Amino acid sequence: MSVKAAPGLDRAAVPPVWEVEFVAVGTDLKEAVLWSPAAAEAASRATVLVDGDRHTLLPAPGAEVPVGEPGEYLLDPNPAVTRAGLVAELARATGTWQIDDRIAFLAAAAPVATPFARTLRVLDSGPWREKDLGARIRALDVGSVDIRRRGLAGDVDVLRKRLARALAGGGRRATLVMTRARDRPWALICVDA
């Protein structure tokens, strides 16, 4: 038996012998499915549907995922992976490492193709200092940004307004990642890989 639920389902409300499957269509987390003990295969799973193909990530035992400095590439795991608690499994499957032990971003030295994460090429990586950010953005000819924030407080709309002058006239679109790296506030300016 299965029960469809909202993707924001409180995991604590799920009986311990039931499986929770988080389903995303592309990068949009759409639903959670609870599987009864008779149908359950694992405690959780992430399913990502891309162009008609179904990709599933299951829990798997393995070595602890290393934590290190950000690399040349950054993986932003699919929301189905993060909700299912399978970031470590994704890291082991892709040969990547975490940039902070409490944050879901993963790092790589080379591009990684996986349906379970968006891979970004890192153009600039350094400690988070808002006062220096405008100069870093201008130096890269960035004119518009998608801001991703994990592990740091702050209002992305306020930051976007503060960066408006730095973004004026730039020709490149980028993703600004505000996060933590090895427990330090960190900023990465990235483009799609």
Describe every region a protein language model picked out.
Residues 2-193:
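SAM-dependent transferase fold signal centered on methyltransferase-like domains
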